[in-house]
Curated annotation (Swiss-Prot):
This is 1,4-alpha-glucan branching enzyme GlgB. InterPro entries: A-amylase/branching_C, Branching_enzy, GlgB, GlgB_N_E_set_prok, Glyco_hydro_13_cat_dom, Glyco_hydro_13_N, Glyco_hydro_b, Glycoside_hydrolase_SF. The keyword Nuclease does not apply. One of its GO terms (molecular function) is cation binding.
């Protein structure tokens, strides 16, 4: 057996695999634990390996032995790994492990390392190893390795795979369907990336995939691993990146999966208060245990390596780095504060090893606090993520847009406050699934006013997001302003698009997405100071916000003006950085987008009229509850109008 295994995994020995596993540095555990062919001969059977260090006995039971105890496994006491060769086992048979736990209880457990599971609600693992796949994404991957993503557009379409669309009989889409329909749709809409909510095996659809049982398997209801590989392959050939949510902090409490696997805390913390996640009805991983680290890091590498993912969004980072995040009792760390030292160290380790192997990957944190530096280099004291969701921006902006415009003048800080901290992290601006469920209402429904005004404000909200520094994310159905909340077990309300206003809203989102990709000032300077220049963030009376996004060249900039009231602002004056002529290139109130305007504002010629610290200014008309974007048409870049700001080339 050892010779065959060594051949399969290069020249690494079984003992080395075990040692690295116990040290927390085995990042390809999926090539060792779980089920693997004994040799290349299809008739030679499979070897099964599972970690259950405190079990009294483990049997592998399956279709190959009528689910009896005829195949007791052998324990390697040093590593805690049980193993057995089963010559009779064949591909696609079902199996589980019968674990005699430390207290003598016998329970059927699924294989934590399985790469395929029986379709839910059944929970058996499947005897199967993934076959080599013929990828055709070399050009895409080569470009990604050479690209600095901080200075390139990232606009993410967030998707819950099974509920994007449903068939006429009510059955939800699988990846075979999504390859045919989602990819051309995303390409047409102008997004750069698709981010999937968790795709790994999970027993409860209502968890949306955030309470996992199988960290190495595509959810059986979503299609086959090869179908997902086909999907990623096709995305890359269409210049679309693929990200997946990953949940390394907590897992499903289901008794037949990871929970107290050998009858003792195996994957979870020893301390029951730390193990139990009361708020989510789940269990927390012991992030300080070396074997758990090997398990989780191997899961990340499995998805990145085997499926050519372009990155991951790590779910619920706050729960991993703060001891007092959850409900219920908690104990301070050895320094007397609330930081989860093991969780912090694990996430730094995760980012370090993943970025070493895949420097081109996008690693994003869903994290809502402001007390820890999440993005940035580990050497600078950060946890090491590339990006962090800006939950503060999202909460403030949505509160503002739900507000009656009469009160907005006294709350303009809700949309301007983010200008004070936009460089504190590398941010993604998220309008995600979390904001359109559980009675929170859809984005469209959140907007103040009648239906016409709701569409107008949704266009303005999206314009503000796209013009604001940071990467972008929008949850599916937001692009056309679906009025109903998202339902995880039901396809999106595509029938909405029969309505002219929804269809025009979808068209606007597509135009805005393509505009973002084409306009370099919106991304080429990344987080540099020079990319953002605020013209006026203090116009409370008119409740109008104006700012500039700069590119590398002096002449490359966009002027953004947003009107948050239902009053059209005519002859509205703002300062401009250079003397000359400015032309309107986007107006959210155009008829093609669902507004009433049939033509753009005439070009604006600057005047030597001071505005704040600007020597030159222009006047224009800003539509009610709308936004306009201006671009220099013919300007004198040799002398800057502003007295206080010098934009460097």
């Amino acid at each position: 057996m050892a010779v065959n295994t060594e051949e399969r995994h290069g020249q690494e020995s079984l003992e080395n695999h075990k040692h690295m596993f116990n040290q927390g540095v085995n990042y390809e555990l999926y090539n060792f634990l779980g089920v693997h062919k004994i040799s290349r001969d299809d008739e030679s059977g499979y070897v099964f390996r599972v970690w259950a260090p405190h079990a009294k006995q483990v049997w592998v039971c399956g279709d190959f032995n009528n689910w009896d105890k005829s195949h007791p496994m052998i324990l390697d006491e040093k590593s805690g790994i049980w193993s057995i060769e089963v010559k009779e086992s064949r591909e696609n048979q079902y199996y589980k492990y019968l674990v005699k736990q430390a207290n003598g209880r016998e329970i059927m457990k699924t294989d934590p390392m399985a790469q395929v599971y029986e379709k839910r609600p059944e929970t058996a693992a499947v005897v199967k190893e993934l076959e080599p796949f013929k990828w055709n994404d070399g050009l895409w991957r080569g470009r990604q390795k050479r690209m600095n993503h901080f200075n390139n557009p990232i606009n993410i379409y967030e998707v819950h795979a099974p509920s994007w669309k449903e068939h006429e009989d009510g059955s939800l889409y699988t990846f075979k369907d999504l390859t045919a329909e989602l990819i051309p749709y995303v390409k047409k809409m102008g997004y750069t990336h698709i981010e999937f909510m968790p795709l790994m095996e999970h027993p409860l659809p209502a968890s949306w995939g955030y309470q996992l049982t199988g960290y190495f398997a595509l959810c059986s209801s979503y299609g086959t691993p090869d179908e997902f590989k086909d999907f990623v392959n096709e995305c890359h050939q269409n210049n679309i990146g693929v990200l997946v949510d990953w949940v390394p902090g907590h897992f499903s409490i289901n008794d037949d999966a990871l929970a107290y696997y050998d009858g003792t805390p195996t994957y979870e913390y020893e301390d029951p208060d730390r193990a139990k996640n009361i708020g989510w009805g789940a269990l927390n991983f012991d992030l300080g245990k070396p074997e758990v680290q090997s398990f989780l890091l191997s899961s990340a590498f499995y998805w990145l390596n085997e499926f050519h993912l372009d990155g991951m969004r790590v779910d619920a980072v706050s729960n991993m780095i703060y001891l007092d995040y959850d409900e219920g009792p908690w104990k301070p760390n050895k320094y007397g504060d609330t930081r989860n030292l093991e969780g912090y160290a694990f996430l730094q380790k995760f980012n370090k090893v993943v970025k070493f192997a895949h420097p081109e990957s996008l690693i994003i944190a869903e994290e809502s606090s402001s007390g820890t530096q999440i993005s940035g280099t580990i050497e600078s004291g950060a946890i090491g993520f590339d990006y962090k969701w800006n939950m503060g921006w999202m909460n403030d902006v949505l509160e503002f847009f739900e507000m009656d415009p009469y009160f907005r003048k006294d709350n303009l800080n809700l949309v301007t406050f983010s200008f004070m901290y936009w460089q504190a992290e590398n941010f993604v601006l998220p309008l995600s699934h979390d904001e359109v469920v559980h009675g929170k209402k859809s984005l469209m429904h959140k907007m103040w006013g009648d239906r016409y005004r709701q569409f107008a404000q949704l266009r303005t909200l999206y314009t503000f997001m796209m013009m604001h520094p940071g990467k972008k994310l929008l949850f599916m159905s937001g692009e056309w302003g679906q009025f109903l909340e998202w339902k995880f077990d039901h396809g999106l309300e595509w029938v909405d698009l029969q309505d002219e206003m929804n269809a025009k809203m979808q068209h606007f989102t597509s135009v805005l997405n393509h505009f973002y990709k084409e306009e370099r000032p919106l991304w080429e300077l990344g987080q540099q100071d020079a990319t953002l220049e605020v013209i006026d963030a203090d116009n409370h009376n008119d409740t109008v916000l104006s700012f500039i996004r700069h590119g590398k060249r002096k002449k490359d900039f966009l002027i953004v003006i947003l009107n948050f009231t239902p009053v059209e602002r005519r002859n509205f004056r703002i300062g401009v950085p250079y003397e000359g002529t400015y032309t309107e290139i986007l107006n959210t109130e155009m008829k093609e987008f669902g507004g009433t305007w049939v033509e753009h504002n005439a070009d604006s010629v600057s005047e030597e009229v001071n505005f704040k610290d600007y020597e030159h200014s222009i006047t224009t008309t800003v539509p009610a509850l709308g936004a306009i974007i201006l671009k220099p048409k013919d300007i004198k870049v040799t002398r800057r109008s502003s007295k206080k700001h010098s934009h460097k080339k």
